[in-house]
Structures are given as C-alpha cells and as structure tokens.
Amino acid sequence: IRLATNERELAWMRYIEGFSKIIGFDMEIIPPEEILRHNPFMTLDGVIAGARTTEDGHADPSGICNALAIGAKNMGAKIVRKNRVTGLTQLPTGEWDVETEKGTIRAEIVVNAAGCYARQIAQMAGIDIPVTNMEHHYVVTDPIPAFKDRDEEIPVMRCPHVSGYFRQEQKSGLIGVYENTGLAEAWAPRGGNPEWDSTSELFPEDLERIAPWLERAIERMPIFGEVGLRRFVNGAIPHTPDGGPLLGPAVGLKNFWHCCGTSFGIAQGGGAGKYLAQWMVFGDADINMTEFDPRRYGPYADEDYSRAKVFLDYRMTFTTRLPGEEEPDGRPQKMSALYGRLLSAGAVYGETYGWERPKYFALDGAEEEGGYHRTNSFDAVAAEVKAVAERVGVLDLSGFAKYDVSGPDA
C-alpha cells in the first residue's frame, strides 16, 4: 500500500489506476479506514488515501535467485560460480571470447547482467554506460510483540512523508530509507566502481544521514519505536539517469546486450529476463521496450551527467512527479546556437536525448506548472498554435532527428 498525503499524490494514483485497468494490473485506491484494516498499527495523520496492489508482496532475494538458477539448469543452462571475467574480445565472426579466471569461453552473444559491476564490464567491451551505484540503507528492528500473535503479515507500506518503505520482516520490523539529503555514491573514492574481489559488500551505516527519515517511519508505525534497532544494512544499488533499467542491444556493438541498471533489483529480475530473452530470440518482445532500450542514451550521458541525474532520481524516489515538470540537474548538455537568445525571449526548455528544446514561450516569465489537467502552459501554447495556423512561425529543429535518404529511388 502506498500512501497519499495530498491531492498531488492522489492525482498520480488515479493516473496509475487508469492504465492499470487497461493492462490488467490489479490495483485499487482505498480510504484511510481501509488502510487501517490491512495495517492496524499505523497512525494516518495527514493520509487521504492509499494505492493497494493486491498481488504484490515481498520475497527472499536469495531464495528467488536459487529458484531461477535451478529452473535455468533444468532447461540446460550451465552455471559456473566464483569465476571472474577478466576480458572481452570480439572476433571477426561477431562472436566473443570471454576471458575468465578458469579459461576462455567462446560466446555467440554476451549479456551484461553484472549489477554493480555492469559499467566495468561495458568498459571491457570498449563502451561506457550511464550507471551510478548508490548507497542505500535499511534497518531491522528487534522482534515486535504485536507481530508474534498474528498469523498474517502487514502489507509492505510506502510513504512519501517517510521517503521510504516499511514492512514486517518475520516478527521484526524493517524500514528502508531513500533520504533526499546527504546522498552518497557507493565506492565514491574508487570512482563509483566496486573492487573485483568484493562480494556482497556492505558499507558502514550512517545513522545521522537517515535518522530524520527513521523518525518519520516510527511516527507512522509507533510499534517500531517500542523496540530496539537490531541491524543496519547499507549496501549498493545501481541506478540509471531516468531510473529505468538498461535492457537491450548495446550501442555500437554486435551481439552484446545489456540487462543491468535495475535499481529495484530482484523485483525486476523475472520480467527483465523474460522480455529481454524474447527480444534476443524473436527480434521483438511482448511489450514495448522503448523505455528500457540502452540506445535511449547518447554520448552526452557521460559520467558527470549520469551522477547528477542518478542523485536526482534517488532523492525523488518517493516524490510525486507531475507531467510537465523538469528538473535542472545535469543540464544543459546539448544546446543549439539559439539557446541563449530563445531563453531570454521566455522559452521554457525541456530535455530530449540531451538536447535543450523549447516547449513553449512564457511571455509572463512564469515557471511551468505540472499537472494532469490544464496548467499555466495551456494559454501560451494555444496562442502559439493560433499564431502559426493563422500566420507563420519559426521552429528551431536542432534537437530533432534528421534522416538522410539517398539512392536511385530516394
């Protein structure tokens, strides 16, 4: 259940509910009293509604990985553990020699599913990808007496006010925090790259950094505050600039695919593997993969851009974004010669494939308001449409795709 504490968050839930019905995803918006029926231990100060996904839950990541591995073996896959890749070389045939500590493997296709190591693997193949590893905390409490007498668990709860999630972990409580101040890149002294011999590496907890959000979680779930904190876990999670995974063919390489940048990890694992496999085998997937295609990024998405956008994505994990809202982080990257002139004339810019493109002109100088209904951009856009329809307009096409078509029948 995700909580809404204002109309902005409720509007987003209604938007999600709309297309959930179209695709057959089971979700409902429930009132506060219904939330309490599912989780009677909460305080709902300021909560106006909740989005309940009836088929969701939580699972043990290790158990899921083992189940997937067993299933793969049953279908003929061979798994070699504790065998580090040391190099990648593409042959004239398009095949790859994958050099490992236990010998070289000749592969028709390579899939980069290396998690926090994905960028380093990509660099072995001669390319780079916009992935930044972030530190992320979760905390486990001591056993909670109120949970011991219950046969059912409370739902996983997500709360923008907490900027995190909380749930039951056996008979204890678990709080995960996405702090929006004092963020830390994992392995920052090493350029964000883990050591090759690192396995399941954890970092020292930073209680001061996450304390304000833990306090908010305890305000929502007072029974968490009745016991001690038993365990702090601070680990690494890879993120991409827009928060979506990299699933698809690598830019500029043949027979090299990405399956990485999944900031929600094992929760995305089954779907990522299924649809990527369809794409690889049949040339297409059952769903539109455009939002995940690694080719959505170009050379502009360098290390600095990736870091700026990933920090933004992390700190806004529980912030509701509305249509029309654009953040300045990592911008501008690509500008036409008219950028400054149009900006001084009131252009409101959006970012597309790294390009700064005017969306409309705010003659009153007001910033664009986001929303699902008419906003302050409506009248300005209407006036521009009328002007072009009745007279003439000039459009800067620098940030749009161009196609060079040549040949006898062009």
What are these regions (language model features)?
Residues 287-288, 294-410:
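Glycine/proline-enriched, intrinsically flexible loops and inter-domain linkers
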Residues 1-2, 36-75, 97, 192-201, ...:
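Helix-loop-beta segment of a Rossmann-like dinucleotide-binding subdomain
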Residues 8, 41-47, 89-97, 239-243, ...:
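A short, glycine/Asx- and small/polar-enriched loop/turn
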Residues 100, 104-153, 287:
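Central helical "cap/lid" subdomain
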Residues 1-38, 161-166, 170-176, 201, ...:
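Dinucleotide-binding Rossmann-like beta1-alpha1 core, especially the glycine-rich loop
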Residues 51-109, 113, 117-120, 270:
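Helical element adjacent to the flavin cofactor pocket in flavoenzyme catalytic cores
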Residues 125, 139-140, 145-184, 205-208, ...:
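Mid-domain catalytic core of redox enzymes
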Residues 161, 170, 184-188, 197-334:
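C-terminal catalytic lobe of FAD-dependent flavoproteins
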